[in-house]
Amino acid sequence: MSGNLQREALLKEFENAGKMIHAFDTAPEGNGEEDTITELPVVKNPGLGVSSETKAENMEDTGFPRWTEFFAKNETVSLPNRNFTFNTYFQVPEVNSSDLSSIPIFLAHHGAGSTGLTFAPLAKTLKEDLGTNFGFFSFDARGHGETKPLDPTDVTYYLNDFVTDFVELIVWFYENYLKACKQSKLSLILVGHSLGGSVCANLYEHLPEYIKRHTTGLAMLDIVEEMAKFVLTKVDHFLSVTPNVFGSAKEAVDWYQSHNYSKLKESAEISVPALFHKAKSGKVVRITNLASFKPYWDSWFDGLSAKFVSLPTSKLLILAGNDNLDKELIVGQMQGKYQLIVFQDSGHFIQEDVPKKAAISLVDFWKRSDNRNVTIKTNWGSSQNKTLEGKKTVE
């Protein structure tokens, strides 16, 4: 598709303010008959904070599901050198309980205006598939959810701020929880939705070597540089027609559902209340002020596609409802530099709308990216499977 034709398509797609974030369809999570998947290329992998258990629930009286149904722990992590206390959610694999040759640890970063609980449905679905033999880490980024600045007068929102925050949180998680795991089994997968995808793509090179060597791949959810930059030009109008105050958390959930911003009710009931805090009046008020990020938008997505394609690790891009790629991604796809999956029945929040499909895709990505999981089934010597590193499965 030429640049002009693609831009015209994007203009049509986003001319309606209600479709600013993504062109939603109304289909429920389906059987995937129209989804598209490309092959995964074979790639060879190239100050700690103080934490405390979060004691109170911001919206605990909503009657909706609590974080405990999705994660094992919810801790507040203080990182003075980052000027923030971060609200984190995570699941730690059971030590010495796995017969797997590798244990996946998914490290997730949400997009602008969201919170760490956007990954709750995905984490729960992964647990249903993998049991206790996996880890998952999610958190509220600066300016979002229950994460708070130590000095509110000295806060910026450049891409590098988000990147450095996440790097330090990954180090904290590794030092405090992952060191107890058998190091030879660790397989870290970076997962970023929207802005979080840009954060993950840019942080890879900043990871300490002792963590980078365990990093198996990067999965970006519904983010394309050219489209993301265009969407930012429409945010002002989107904000002008989006309510910041609701009479209750239930009203907020109902609004998101009725406007197709969340396709699964069970996902909306955990992710939407986390976007608001309860005022003394009893009403709920949106926590994140997206308008305050405007001076920093130019730094968020510049060069993302080229960065993603060139990363020296396995890469997965999952898009929702369309397959519009910019030039860098088209060339990279033709060269087999990353795997592409398109879900036709999902909105922008893939991890909420189709958590089962997203989980299946991430598990498959992990297994195919980590050579320790690959086996050859032989017809000689023994009926048992023999594991050979670096080979594909052969019947």
From Swiss-Prot:
Lineage top rank: taxon: Eukaryota
Membrane-traversing stretches: none
The family this protein is said to belong to: Belongs to the AB hydrolase superfamily.
Role, per record: Demethylates proteins that have been reversibly carboxymethylated. Demethylates the phosphatase PP2A catalytic subunit.
Active site: residue positions: 194, 222, 348
Annotated keywords: Hydrolase, Serine esterase
Signal peptide range: none
Name of the protein in its database record: Protein phosphatase methylesterase 1
Molecular function via GO: protein C-terminal methylesterase activity
InterPro entries: AB_hydrolase_1, AB_hydrolase_fold, PPase_methylesterase_euk
Gene source species: Kluyveromyces lactis (strain ATCC 8585 / CBS 2359 / DSM 70799 / NBRC 1267 / NRRL Y-1140 / WM37) (Yeast)
